[in-house]
Swiss-Prot record:
A GO biological-process term: fumarate metabolic process
Location in or out of the cell: Cytoplasm
Similarity section: Belongs to the class-II fumarase/aspartase family. Fumarase subfamily.
Record's catalysed reaction(s): (S)-malate = fumarate + H2O
PROSITE patterns: FUMARATE_LYASES
Subunit structure: Homotetramer.
Originating organism: Staphylococcus saprophyticus subsp. saprophyticus (strain ATCC 15305 / DSM 20229 / NCIMB 8711 / NCTC 7292 / S-41)
Protein name (record): Fumarate hydratase class II
PANTHER family in the cross-refs: ASPARTATEAMMONIA/ARGININOSUCCINATE/ADENYLOSUCCINATE LYASE, FUMARATE HYDRATASE, MITOCHONDRIAL
Anything else known: There are 2 substrate-binding sites: the catalytic A site, and the non-catalytic B site that may play a role in the transfer of substrate or product between the active site and the solvent. Alternatively, the B site may bind allosteric effectors.
Top-level class of the enzyme under EC nomenclature: lyase
NCBIfam families linked to this entry: fumC_II, PRK12273.1
Known EC number: 4.2.1.2
C-alpha cells in the first residue's frame, strides 16, 4: 500500500496515500478498532454545514482571508455533494466528545481545500486546526453537527413517512366508515364499533405524534456553536456563534439559531432526550397498530380474520401455503429497538459531568438509528401492508351477530342487572341473545328488535 507521512503533536504517522484524512484520523482508526458502527455520514454532512458556516463567519469577522474562505467552502460543498464519503472511516466508539470525528472533517476539508488553492495558483495553505477549526472546539462542534443532522433527518425522512402512513389510514377510515363490527376490550367482546372508527384511532395516534414531533424538533434548532471548550466562548468572536447559525440556516433552509446558554448546550442533551421521547411515543403507537392489524388478520380459518392483508411471501419452510403477517412483525421489532434506544439515550444524556457530556456519539448513533428505523419501517409497512388492508364482511357480521355484548343497549330500558342475566343465560345455555332476552320475560320480541340495533350503538345517543 502506498503511503504518505502526516504529523500531529504526537509526531509522524503513515497514512494511505489515496485517503484525504490526516494524522489524528489515522491514530483514531488504530486506537479504536471497536465494533462496526461507523460515525453516521449524516453527521459528517452536519459537520460540513458547520465548517462551511464557520468559514463564512470567520471571514465576515476579519479572521479568514478571501482565498481560505473560498477554499474551505469549496471543500465543504464537495462533502455535502457526497463526493468524499470514503474519507470518513471512523467508528462511533471513540472519545465521548467526538473529537476524532471533528478532526477527521477538519483534516479532509483542509486536504481538499489545499488542493483547490494549489490548483488556483494561490500561495496560501490551510491548517485543519488553525483555519478549518478556527474559533471552534470539538465540544461545541459535535453537538452542533449532531443537531443539524438530526433535524434534517426528521424533516426529510421521518415526517414524510409518518404523513404517508397517516394518510393511508385516513383513506381507510373513510372507506370503511359504514362497516360495523364488534369492538373488543381486554381481548373480550365489547360493544359495536365502526371499522372506520377503529382505524381513526390509529390515524389519530399518528396525528398526535406528528404534533409532538413538530414540538420536540423545534428544540433541536438550538446550536452549541460559539461555546468553544467549556461554554465561555474562549478564542471565538462574541458574534461568531450567531453568524455561524445564520449561515447554516441560510444554506439548509432550516431556522437554526445559536443556543441562548452555551454551558447547557455542551453539558446537557435534554433536547435530544425529548426528541427521542417522541420517537419512543411513536414506536409505542406503531407497536399497538401493528399488533391490532395482525390480530384482526389472524387466521385464515382459526383466527379472527376480520381483515385481510397482502400476502407478500411464503411464511413457513415446513408448512406449505402458510402466509404470515411479516410486515407487522417487522414493525413491532422496530418499535422494540427504538424503545431500547430510548433507554440508552436517556442514560447517556444523564452523564454530563461538569462542563461537558462525553457520551455524545452514542446519543447520536441511537437517535439517528431510531429515526431511520421508524421512517423505513413506516414506509415499508405502508407500502406492503396498510394500503392493502381490506375487510372480510362475512366474518365481521358473524362476530357482530353472535356477540352477547349487544345486550348493553338494553341497559337504559331494563337496567344493568337484568341485562346481565340475559347475557349470562345466553352464554350458559347456548342461546342467541334474542332467544335469551325473550325467554327471560324482560323484553318482547318487538322491543328487542327496536332496541338492539348495532347501527344505533356506534355513536352517542
Amino acid at each position: 500500500m502506498s503511503v504518505r507521512i502526516e504529523h500531529d503533536t504526537f509526531g509522524e504517522i503513515e497514512v494511505p496515500a489515496d485517503k484525504y484524512w490526516g494524522a489524528q484520523t489515522e491514530r483514531s482508526k488504530r486506537n479504536f478498532p471497536v465494533g462496526k458502527e461507523r460515525m453516521p455520514i449524516e453527521v459528517v454532512y452536519g459537520f460540513a454545514q458547520l465548517k462551511r458556516g464557520a468559514a463564512l463567519a470567520n471571514h465576515a469577522l476579519g479572521k479568514l482571508s478571501d482565498a481560505k474562505k473560498d477554499a474551505i467552502v469549496y471543500a465543504c460543498d464537495r462533502v455535502l455533494n457526497k463526493e468524499l464519503d470514503e474519507h470518513f472511516p471512523l467508528v462511533v466508539w471513540q472519545t465521548g466528545s467526538g473529537t476524532q470525528s471533528n478532526m477527521n472533517v477538519n483534516e479532509v476539508v483542509s486536504y481538499v481545500a489545499n488542493t483547490y488553492l494549489k490548483e488556483q495558483g494561490i500561495d496560501e495553505s490551510i491548517h485543519p486546526n488553525d483555519d478549518v477549526n478556527k474559533s471552534q472546539s470539538s465540544n461545541d462542534t459535535f453537538p452542533t453537527a449532531m443537531h443539524v443532522a438530526l433535524y434534517n433527518e426528521v424533516e426529510t425522512k421521518l415526517e414524510p413517512a409518518l404523513k404517508t402512513l397517516r394518510d393511508t389510514f385516513k383513506q381507510k377510515e373513510e372507506q370503511y366508515h359504514d362497516i360495523i363490527k364488534i369492538g373488543r376490550t381486554h381481548l373480550q367482546d365489547a360493544t359495536p364499533i365502526r371499522l372506520g372508527q377503529e382505524i381513526s384511532g390509529w390515524r389519530y395516534m399518528l396525528d398526535k405524534c406528528e404534533t409532538l414531533l413538530s414540538e420536540s424538533k423545534a428544540h433541536i434548532l438550538n446550536l452549541a456553536i460559539g461555546g468553544t471548550a467549556v461554554g465561555t466562548g474562549i478564542n471565538a468572536h462574541p458574534e461568531f456563534g450567531d453568524k455561524v447559525a445564520k449561515f447554516i440556516a441560510e444554506n439548509t433552509g432550516y431556522p437554526f439559531v445559536s443556543s441562548e446558554n452555551k454551558f447547557h448546550a455542551l453539558t446537557a442533551h435534554d433536547e435530544v432526550v425529548q426528541l427521542h421521547g417522541t420517537l419512543k411515543a411513536l414506536a409505542t403507537d406503531l407497536m399497538k397498530i401493528a399488533n391490532d392489524v395482525r390480530w384482526l388478520a389472524s387466521g385464515p380459518r382459526a383466527g379472527l380474520a376480520e381483515i385481510s392483508i397482502p400476502e407478500n411471501e411464503p411464511g413457513s419452510s415446513i408448512m406449505p401455503g402458510k402466509v404470515n403477517p411479516t410486515q407487522c412483525e417487522m414493525l413491532t421489532m422496530v418499535a422494540v429497538q427504538v424503545m431500547g434506544n430510548d433507554t440508552a439515550v436517556g442514560i447517556a444524556s444523564s452523564q454530563g459531568n461538569f462542563e461537558l457530556n462525553v457520551y455524545k456519539p452514542v446519543i447520536l448513533l441511537n437517535t439517528l438509528q431510531s429515526i431511520y428505523l421508524l421512517a423505513d419501517g413506516m414506509d415499508t409497512f405502508n407500502n406492503n401492508c396498510a394500503v392493502g388492508i381490506e375487510p372480510i364482511p362475512e366474518n365481521i357480521d358473524n362476530y357482530l351477530n353472535q356477540s352477547l355484548m349487544l345486550v348493553t343497549a338494553l341497559n337504559p330500558h331494563i337496567g344493568y342487572e337484568k341485562a346481565a342475566s340475559i347475557a349470562k343465560k345466553a352464554h350458559r345455555e347456548g342461546l342467541t341473545l334474542k332467544e335469551s332476552a325473550i325467554d327471560s320475560g324482560y323484553v318482547t320480541e318487538e322491543q328487542f328488535e327496536q332496541w338492539i340495533k348495532p347501527e344505533d350503538m356506534v355513536e352517542p345517543k
